A protein has these predicted regions:
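Arg/Lys-rich, low-complexity, intrinsically disordered basic segments
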Residues: 1-85
């Protein structure tokens, strides 16, 4: 997963120290925490139907400027989409 994060532009990937989050990436000098603790993700359950459902739901999350959140590297949604799902 570390190699995947670096290929997406992250400098570092660590376990999150923020309550309720799984991971954190260092991207452009800012830490971005993502992934809810206590919930499974595709890396743990490998269920293609659940992955498709997650992606369908999260495609609908838009930023104020109308861009999908999962396409913007400064959002937790981007990192969860690419590293966990």
């Amino acid at each position: 997963m570390d190699a995947a994060a670096k290929s997406l532009g992250a400098t570092e990937l660590r376990s999150s120290w923020r309550k309720g989050k799984k991971l954190a990436v260092l991207y452009r000098g800012e830490w971005i925490h993502f992934g809810a603790l206590g919930y499974e993700d595709y890396t743990t359950h490998h269920d293609d139907d659940r992955r498709a459902s997650y992606r369908r739901r999260h495609k609908a999350i838009l930023l104020r400027d109308g861009r999908p959140a999962y396409k913007v590297k400064t959002t937790p949604a981007f990192w969860a989409w690419h590293l966990l799902w």
